[in-house]
Amino acid sequence: MAVEFYRYSYRTAEHDGDVEEYRASRDENRRCTEFIQHPQTGLYANAYKDNVVDKDGAYLDKCISKFGMQRMMFVIANTVKMSKHDGRWSPEVKEWAKDFMTSHTSEYADGYLSQIHTGVVNILAEKIIKKYNGLNLFSRKHCMDESVDMEGKVIVLNHMSMKEEYWKPEYQLCLATGGFGCRPTASGRAVYATCLYDGDKARWNRENVLGVLKDEYLPDWAREKLEELQNTGPEEEQTGGINLN
């Protein structure tokens, strides 16, 4: 099982008491890059032939299975970041890497592919972008303005705050039931919410929420679940259920 990816800085880890998680993730970042660059397990030895990179996608799938998609995305995006002025990066890859790294740690030293040709990494990046986009996850573009009060509305959780096994759009949609974090101007962070897909209740922080879902993006199944929840009457707020984060 892959070591859980920690996407924040050491300062944040120290503040939150997550230094062990930070170090374990940092070490796994290094193992990931070593694996991809190794003479025996690496990309060149296993997925590069006749100038074709990972033709069937099997090598990328293997790396994702071993290290997790978020870590693979980080290593590739970090590689772009470390040589952002290299003109061989495609505009799509450069923009993706910039957006990805904005929401991740600003410490770039650990976890980048220094021994793989830029053109090869660029192709690998295009492949993982395509795979990621295929998940059809909700993003900020599906949400209303941040000034909206979230209580009583369908909110979109940031999948980056979840374990990768829950990186599915149905797990992102929740009914916000309360908490000071629902209010855009409040100092509180807590957002209590019920997952529309399975009914589990959990406490999130406001930064884990992308926003309130625009009505036109609400799937039919979610609309039905929402009506069921609204018709059951008020329930006592509680945390618990599955641990998505």
Task: Please annotate each region the language model reported.
Residues 1-245:
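Gram-negative host-targeted secretion-system effectors, predominantly Type III and Type IV
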